[in-house]
Amino acid sequence: MSLDISQFPVLAQANTPNELRQLPQALLPQLADELREFLLKSVGMSSGHFASGLGTVELTVALHYVYNTPFDRLIWDVGHQAYPHKILTGRRDRMHTIRQKNGLHPFPWREESEYDTFSVGHSGTSISAALAMAVAAEKEQAGRKVVAVIGDGAMTGGMVFEAMNHAGDLHNDMLMVLNDNEMSISENVGALNNHLAQLMSGRLYTTIRESSKKVLKGMPVIKEMAKRTEEHLKGMVVPGTLFEELGFNYIGPIDGHDVDALVETLRNMRSLKGPQVLHIMTKKGRGYEPAEKDPIGWHAVPKFDPSQFKKPATKPGLPTFSQVFGKWLCDIAEQDEKVLGITPAMREGSGMVEFSQRFPKQYFDAAIAEQHAVTLGAGFACEGFKPVVAIYSTFLQRGYDQLIHDVALQRLPVLFAIDRGGIVGADGPTHQGAFDLSFMRCIPNMVIMAPSDENECRQMLYTGYCYDAGPSAVRYPRGSATGATQVEAMTALPIGKGVIKRLGKRIAMLNFGTTLAAALTAAESLDATVVDMRFVKPLDVDLVKEMAQTHDVLVTVEENAIMGGAGSGVLELLQKLKMPKPVLQIGLPDEFIKHGSPEEVTHDLQLDAEGMLAQINAFLAD
């Protein structure tokens, strides 16, 4: 159910950027207030990313007011902050469907709107894409402008600086808006700095600046002196030296919640030549007190009543696999001070809050820099430490070369705790953990484990901790554990050995991971054997051979891409053993998995017990 737009009289007049640009500038502050209120209520109805969008309301209004979108290109890095953008670009009446099956995409998505010029979800991609679009715009000579909006968190990734280094060299016209919500230099925000930014972006200043460069071109000594003088004067009030060194003209920081100042500064900057940086200061969660006080806790929210000023109480229930990992990490750190926990900026999501507080000297947040996080683990392993890299499946993709070159090639004992393996759900195709078993299985020296429940998860983590012949990975899903009885004593499992969970006839289901419960349910109707394979690599050769010899049909089950996954490993083994056998592979299809609740996606892909049974019966009927 959508909100009554009559309660938002100015927002009602701005369903598209064209309509927004028809409004008098005097109405923009009221529009921003109404947009923030609409965002607050709509996310309360639907769930979704919350605090980031509250902080970019004024910026979104100003950008669409000054720039001729979608002709001018606007790219949002990551996309958590883009809900106001969606509201102002014709999707207002569908905001209550965001992140839901067949609803609006959780991030900017090219297939959804012409205003979404680049599909996003992972951080640090915006500057590279914007640079390419800026080069294309220059070739077209149509007067197109290009803007990228990136947060200070994403600025910790190396790809951003690679792109900025290239942009500074090419010197195409583009604007990078740095949305800084960490308040690290808040003393520079205010009327004086807003005024300074408008002066520095104004035509008189830039004309004098560029003319002076031409005059001084033939006098390098004086030119260098003038440059240093300018940098010194600017450096007294602005922290832009790094950007200037990379070839960008730096403006700011200015108040990112002053829509009039943003409009005037953006108008000035729109005509500037070369790469530009506008540094704005914002507050994550702006306008909603609980989110302002706890922006991390309010980063993403379930459905809630904004009038209650609190999120709904979490119902007591089973721990999540992330919490199971976090507790294990604390338990093992109590015993071994050489255990080091590494995360690429996912402390909360990976269950490492308690570990970071209890063992601060053993905790390393590498920021949004997955390549660095993986090689950091490799370096620690070289020095005899026990590094544990906690990382989401989708983000391990970003450190793949380091996994091969820096870890596996050297047989370094780095343990990878891979969270969000398999179906993630509402965050959609950019975040589904669909590929990790496939891209890790082909790497020599890797040991890969897939626990079927939380107790097995603990034992496998301990197995990886004890394994010193090379890297190991334990891959587990998002969400609640299964309720298995936890065995406190930790025992290293025999490498490459599975266990039979149910003896049946004719059909043997070889299960990898937490799909075991559904496989057991399906097996009841089929009277099938069920094996908890435990290890994706190395496979239990003897057990696979036994199942092939004693059953007519094998079924592999995994929550990973079928192509190259665990089932492919079973087929490769059977071929090597010269044991031809009908094999049905159940897993994720060769497509990017759309957003929806995990239950909906699992059902649609026939990965629940009902779907498995249907797939097996259809296979047997052929």
Curated annotation (Swiss-Prot):
Residue positions binding thiamine diphosphate: H80, G121, H122, S123, G153, A154, N181, Y288, E370
Record's keyword terms, sorted: Isoprene biosynthesis, Magnesium, Metal-binding, Thiamine biosynthesis, Thiamine pyrophosphate, Transferase
Pfam families per UniProt: DXP_synthase_N (PF13292), Transket_pyr (PF02779), Transketolase_C (PF02780)
Cofactor(s) this protein requires: Mg(2+); thiamine diphosphate
Enzyme Commission identifier(s): 2.2.1.7
GO cellular component assignments: cytosol
Covalent S-S links between cysteines: none
Residues given in the record as Mg(2+) binding sites: D152, N181
Swiss-Prot/TrEMBL GO biological process terms: 1-deoxy-D-xylulose 5-phosphate biosynthetic process; isopentenyl diphosphate biosynthetic process, methylerythritol 4-phosphate pathway; terpenoid biosynthetic process; thiamine biosynthetic process
InterPro entries xrefs: Dxylulose-5-P_synthase, THDP-binding, Transketo_C/PFOR_II, Transketolase-like_Pyr-bd, Transketolase_BS, Transketolase_C, Transketolase_CS
Reactions performed catalytically: D-glyceraldehyde 3-phosphate + pyruvate + H(+) = 1-deoxy-D-xylulose 5-phosphate + CO2
Ranges in coiled-coil conformation: none
HAMAP family xref list: DXP_synth
Assembly and oligomerization: Homodimer.
PANTHER family from the UniProt entry: 1-D-DEOXYXYLULOSE 5-PHOSPHATE SYNTHASE-RELATED (PTHR43322), 1-DEOXY-D-XYLULOSE-5-PHOSPHATE SYNTHASE, CHLOROPLASTIC (PTHR43322:SF5)
Family to which the UniProt record says this protein belongs: Belongs to the transketolase family. DXPS subfamily.
Full protein name: 1-deoxy-D-xylulose-5-phosphate synthase
Gene: dxs
